[in-house]
A protein has these predicted regions:
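C-terminal helix/juxtamembrane-tail motif
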Residues: 1-4, 13-18, 474, 492-512
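N-terminal membrane-proximal hinge/A-helix region immediately C-terminal to the signal-anchor transmembrane segment
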Residues: 2-112
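Cytochrome P450
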Residues: 20-30, 55, 78-82, 106-149, ...
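Conserved cytochrome P450 K-helix E-x-x-R motif and the immediately C-terminal K′/meander segment
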Residues: 45-57, 333-386, 391-396, 402, ...
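Cytochrome P450 heme-thiolate monooxygenase catalytic core
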Residues: 139-302
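Central I-helix of cytochrome P450 enzymes
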Residues: 268-328, 361, 396, 454, ...
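Cytochrome P450 heme-binding "Cys pocket" and the immediately downstream C-terminal segment
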Residues: 315, 438, 443, 455-492
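Conserved cytochrome P450 K-helix/beta-meander segment immediately N-terminal to the heme-binding cysteine loop
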Residues: 397-432
Length: 512
């Protein structure tokens, strides 16, 4: 017994020595300071995941504006000086922004690699998204989203709104239902040819299917951070089933039965069929990736925008006046006779108050991370220093450090609806840090060539949502003094953070 214990003790000691020798990176000359963490493989992952912002602030104070941390088997160089961000952007020949995203998509959604270098497809997905989510294509999306938002808000649940009584709901649940249903109809089409085809039975059937898809989406989305981290989805049986059900609805044979499908999905179906070797299930899972990308950040961004708007009387007053002025200038009248309010892209772009509210809400809730993978050993040249970076290491920017910097944003934890308005009430685009003008001051959508191609549509649909809510509804928080919910840190690095709890509110149709 004693001998066995001694043997096991020796084995443990040898394993520890082996890990110490091979599992710990030693800093070479010219490299940033490195922190390996105490846990094999995980390194600093648990500390970082618990509260990324505080973790990075502490390391910034200890090591300076650039440092390296081992996180889940990868060595990540965090760059914290916003004046050095452009140095990362301009050294693109050494850094690959696609590799990390392609790998994360394959792990999370279960399709084969979408990296053209791996031979499954020759589609340039980033160009597909730019082509179908910006320019003239954006105008069609805005038009469709306006119609679908009003259908969902006013017709999809008319039984609740017939009387003049208040309807009580969870604010996040409300935003989730409205934005998911409207966004799904806008991108993936309807089961009817036009609004005139919608009888009650068809409406209820379509709504039941989409709300069922929403439940599957939420079940799958809950474990999304774990999937990106590399945990196999089979560990999560219910989430795995939810993902497969979502994908089943997006098979090409099912999508072809739908009407008014967006240009994005139509083009992706064509390119999947002509440029890829994916089977039907993998094609569907690439569409699931589009669905997730269109909803996972837009829904919480909508919630935070509406929550801060309702909570601030000054913001409510300014936003309501802007909406009324914009509708009046457009000759749009608010009524409930079935005629939709219609604002085009130019009119929506000329709403700086709503734009500032959305930006401020996203500044307070965004925890995205800009990631680049080193293609080779190279020297990262910053304005005043140079650092050696090893092949396959990750260079990361964490914009929440920027967004919460009191030297850039006075009282950074407080919502100020006019923070992004200048003295003339127009968009403010000039910000300073320690007296020096910043090139990068607002980065919820990433930066450079990897900037989210759907960002324009996302902002426009939130702006449409707020415009319609302010136009059609009286809306109040049940508790006007309710504290702001905490941010769910489990999703840090993925975009807009969800609230840890919902907020109760009430709404009813205005007497028009």
């Amino acid at each position: 017994m004693l001998a066995a214990s001694l043997i096991w003790g020796i084995v443990v000691i040898l394993c520890c020595c082996f890990w110490f020798i091979l599992g710990i990176r030693r800093r070479r000359p010219g490299e940033p300071p490195v922190e390996n963490g105490l846990l094999p493989y995980l390194g600093c992952a648990l500390q970082f995941g618990a509260n990324p912002l505080e973790f990075l602030k502490a390391r910034q104070k200890k090591y300076g504006h650039i440092f390296t941390c081992k996180v889940a088997g990868k060595y990540v160089h965090f760059l914290t000086d916003p004046f050095s961000y452009h140095s990362v952007m301009r050294q693109g020949r050494h850094l690959d922004w696609k590799k990390f995203h392609f790998a994360a998509s394959a792990k999370a959604f279960g399709h084969g690699s979408i990296d053209p270098r791996d031979g499954n497809t020759t589609e340039n997905m980033h160009q597909t998204f730019i082509r179908t989510l910006q320019g003239n294509a954006l105008n069609s999306l805005i038009e469709a989203m306006t119609e679908n938002l009003q259908y969902v808000m006013l017709q999809s649940s008319t039984s609740k709104l017939h009387s003049n009584n208040w309807v009580t709901d969870g604010l996040y649940a409300f935003c989730c239902r409205v934005m998911f249903e409207s966004g799904f109809l806008t991108l993936f089409g309807t089961e009817f040819n036009s609004t005139q085809d919608k009888n009650l039975s068809q409406r209820e059937t379509q709504r039941a299917l989409i709300l069922n898809a929403l439940e599957n989406f939420k079940e799958f989305d809950k474990i999304f951070p774990a999937l990106v981290a590399g945990v196999p989805i089979h560990v999560f049986k219910s989430a795995h089933n939810a993902r497969e059900k979502l994908a089943e609805a997006l098979f090409h044979e099912n999508l072809r039965k739908r009407n008014n499908i967006s240009e994005l999905v139509t083009l992706r179906m064509f390119l999947n069929d002509t440029l890829s070797t994916f089977d039907d299930k993998e094609k569907a899972k690439t569409h699931l990736a589009v669905l997730w990308a269109s909803q996972a950040n837009t829904i919480p961004a909508t919630f935070w925008s509406l929550f801060y708007l309702i909570r601030s009387p000054e913001a409510m007053k300014a936003a309501t006046e802007e909406v009324q002025k914009t509708l009046g200038n457009a000759g749009e009248k608010i009524d409930l006779d079935g005629k939709c309010i219609s604002l085009n892209r130019k009119q929506l772009d000329n709403m700086p108050v709503l734009d500032s509210i959305i930006k401020e809400a996203m500044r307070l809730s965004s925890a995205s991370m800009t990631v680049r993978v080193a293609k080779e050993d190279f020297t990262l040249h910053l304005d005043n220093d140079s650092y050696n970076i090893r092949k396959d290491d990750i260079v990361a920017l964490y914009p929440q450090l920027l967004h919460f910097d009191p030297d850039i944003y006075a009282d950074p934890l407080t919502f100020k609806y006019d923070r992004y308005l200048d003295e003339n009430g127009e968009e403010k685009t000039i910000f300073y840090r320690n007296g020096h003008k910043l090139r990068y001051y607002y980065m919820p959508f990433g930066s450079g060539i990897a900037k989210c191609p759907g960002r324009l549509f996302a902002v426009h649909e939130i702006k449409q949502f707020l415009t319609l809510v302010l136009s059609y509804f009286e809306i109040e928080l049940l508790d006007s003094n309710v504290p702001c919910p905490s941010l769910d840190q489990s999703r840090a690095g993925l975009g807009i953070l969800q609230p840890t709890n919902d907020i109760h509110f009430k709404y009813r149709l205005k007497c028009l």
